[in-house]
């Protein structure tokens, strides 16, 4: 007998609420402002069935293209075969949240602007590119009271 593959099949854990987060939804969810062009994460809320996305879109990130009274339209790029297809999904605000994916970039832009302002006031140049972590500096370890130990592998034995 074949198994049924309904709209919400296989979502027993994906759509469940977080630990100690059951019950009424906080009002802050409804008071968030979404604007066209915002980057949002889709996270389906299992306690609200209206405007819930298909399980494929759970955990995906998209861009808001439409805002209505109680829902937002989100554009997501879906991989189909060997290409991307732009999908437009309409979701209620309970199932989306602002993405933090650009937060580091926006913070860096602000800090770079502050560094530029400060450098211009002091009349000096500033290097704003990020640098990879450099190797640690050399150290000298004393062997006084710290005798070096020779390490050797333990012979492999089979215990049956």
UniProtKB/Swiss-Prot annotation:
UniProt GO BP: translation
Stretch forming the signal peptide: none
Any GO MF annotation of the entry: structural constituent of ribosome
Keyword terms, alphabetized: Cytoplasm, Ribonucleoprotein, Ribosomal protein
Gene3D superfamilies, A to Z: 6.10.250.3260, Ribosomal protein L21 (2.30.30.70)
A cellular component annotation (GO) from this entry: cytosolic large ribosomal subunit
Chief localisation class: cytoplasm
Assembly notes: Component of the large ribosomal subunit. Mature ribosomes consist of a small (40S) and a large (60S) subunit. The 40S subunit contains about 32 different proteins and 1 molecule of RNA (18S). The 60S subunit contains 45 different proteins and 3 molecules of RNA (25S, 5.8S and 5S).
General function of this protein: Component of the ribosome, a large ribonucleoprotein complex responsible for the synthesis of proteins in the cell. The small ribosomal subunit (SSU) binds messenger RNAs (mRNAs) and translates the encoded message by selecting cognate aminoacyl-transfer RNA (tRNA) molecules. The large subunit (LSU) contains the ribosomal catalytic site termed the peptidyl transferase center (PTC), which catalyzes the formation of peptide bonds, thereby polymerizing the amino acids delivered by tRNAs into a polypeptide chain.
PANTHER family the UniProt entry points to: 60S RIBOSOMAL PROTEIN L21
Protein name: Large ribosomal subunit protein eL21
Gene name in the database record: RPL21A
